[in-house]
Amino acid sequence: PPTIITVAAISIITNLFDTFDRLMEFSKKHLNDPFILEGVQAVSARDAILREIFSNSLAHRDYSTGYVAKFVIEKDRMYTENGNLSHGHGELKLDGFEPFSKNPPIAKVFREVSLADELGSGMRNTYKYTKMYSGGVPEFIEGDVFKTIIPLSSAATSMVGPDGNQDTPQDNLQDTPQDNLQEKVNQVVYEKII
């Protein structure tokens, strides 16, 4: 199995709205937001994807299990995992997907405060914006643990400056063992939601 190096791990023990906000802040800190046009309008495909996967994870999670929900950013993908009251097993496909609300009261509140749209739109939006963001196709895997996998391109995760490839002589003079550790740490980001 691959070794996972943790960049930052925080436990979030708060209400659903603050959890959503903290996940968004954390992700924006660790993922680039390349310039993307949708027609003539600039859009943040990164933020659109994050909104969908976080609201899905929080609104459809099985809170009765002891499974700790996760959000992980790796070099070539990011994914969420959460306990699930499954209605089948295996990969969900956009063309054969039948949406099912697992926590209708939470989903309703999320729609009311604009953290979610109509049932099933999250999967369509995630496909659309993942194609724009990384050129890839997301995976949604249904089971006792629900997993959403978003492929990432190098544009989404590359670092600029002392931790990337654009060092200046001044940066090199100031490199310390801590900088080397930070470079290793930047390989993977792990987030736990409790």
Model regions and ranges:
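C-terminal regulatory or interaction extensions
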Residues: 1-194
